[in-house]
């Protein structure tokens, strides 16, 4: 589990372990947290250290890789694209090199809906044109385009999961979202209602019903289940694939804020800001492929359930203690 100490990676580790897999976490802890590994074998290392990766692969007799490592802030990618190409492209090439040298043939890759850019239609299918609006999406698409060459040359099987808006927390309260600083909408709103700075809403003049961006929010537990199903398909001899992982339903930023108002019993203080460069007005998934091929379903991904699980997690205070462990 490369990057297995982060938000999505840690939930996927939990799902894999519950499905009977042995898990090894490899993370540099630049944004991940040691507490989130929940007792799994855990190695501190960088994805660009191909030699160290090979040693770990051999020591633990690794049979498959899930790759969550990398940078993911849209706004930061606009101001610092070098870092994004280095982490997301060069880092992944280093990982692939180690896999090829050791003979590991299966990988599940953490991609993003940002590879699509401005939608021509909605919900978007996997064959929608890819025209990223920012370096984050471009860096993910660049490495996606490399995978078929590695598959043909080295016999690898690599499936890409294009996430939409991962959100929520483990329903049993074992894990949740803990970024430092926090940039995602729902936990940022929780910070705002808990006395932090107001929530910034970037743009209220989009061509949407209430002027704010529309997003497809998928519960992180459903997202973790998608990884387990895709891995099982590859290990059973199935073909590589590209899969959208979302619900097919969009909520606006204002709708999310209003739901948070209701669930927390507090009003989220907001500040309206100009649009951010690289933000499309709407991103909604058509996830028919993963549902039909693998039997996946977003069973936890209703907005109320997402926010309730995330709010319970926020109230534990774990995210505060974890902030000091993120470096």
Language model regions located:
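Short-chain dehydrogenase/reductase
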Residues: 85, 128, 133-141, 175-187, ...
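Basic phosphate/pyrophosphate-binding loop/patch that engages nucleotide-derived ligands
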Residues: 100, 149-152, 185-194
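C-terminal substrate-binding subdomain of Rossmann-fold SDR/epimerase-dehydratase oxidoreductases
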Residues: 188-327
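Short, flexible, glycine-rich and Lys/Arg-enriched loop motifs at helix boundaries
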Residues: 34, 164-185, 195-215
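N-terminal Rossmann-like NAD(P)+-binding domain of SDR-like oxidoreductases, especially those catalyzing
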Residues: 1-169
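Glycine-centered small-residue hotspots that permit tight backbone geometry or close packing
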Residues: 4, 32-34, 45, 75, ...
């Amino acid at each position: 589990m490369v990057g297995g100490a982060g938000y999505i990676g840690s939930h996927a580790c939990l799902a894999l372990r519950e499905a009977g897999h042995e898990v090894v976490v490899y993370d540099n802890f630049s944004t991940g947290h040691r507490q989130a590994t929940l007792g799994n074998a855990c190695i501190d290392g960088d994805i660009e250290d191909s030699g160290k990766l090979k040693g770990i692969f051999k020591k633990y007799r690794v049979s498959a890789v899930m790759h969550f490592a990398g940078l993911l802030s849209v706004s930061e990618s606009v101001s610092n694209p070098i870092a994004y190409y280095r982490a997301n492209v060069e880092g992944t090439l280093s990982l692939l090199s180690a896999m090829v040298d050791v003979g590991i043939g299966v990988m599940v890759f953490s991609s993003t809906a940002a590879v699509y850019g401005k939608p021509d239609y909605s919900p978007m299918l996997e064959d929608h044109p890819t025209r990223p609006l920012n370096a984050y999406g471009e860096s993910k698409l660049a490495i996606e385009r490399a995978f078929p060459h590695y598959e043909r040359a080295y016999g690898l099987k690599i499936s890409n999961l294009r996430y939409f808006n991962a959100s929520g927390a483990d329903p049993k309260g074992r894990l949740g979202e803990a970024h430092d600083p926090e940039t995602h909408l729902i936990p940022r709103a929780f910070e705002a209602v808990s006395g932090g700075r107001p929530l910034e809403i970037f743009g209220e003049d989009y061509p949407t019903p209430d002027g704010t961006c529309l997003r497809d929010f998928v519960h992180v537990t459903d997202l973790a289940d998608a990884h387990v199903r895709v891995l099982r398909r590859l290990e059973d001899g199935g073909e590589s694939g590209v899969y959208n992982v979302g619900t097919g339903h969009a909520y606006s930023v204002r709708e999310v804020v209003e739901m948070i108002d209701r669930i927390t019993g507090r009003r989220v203080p907001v500040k309206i800001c100009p649009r951010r460069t690289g933000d499309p007005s709407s991103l909604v998934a058509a996830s028919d492929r993963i549902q039909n091929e693998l039997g996946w379903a977003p069973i936890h991904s209703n907005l109320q359930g997402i926010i309730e699980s995330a709010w319970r997690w926020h109230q534990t205070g774990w995210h505060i203690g974890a902030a000091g462990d993120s470096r």
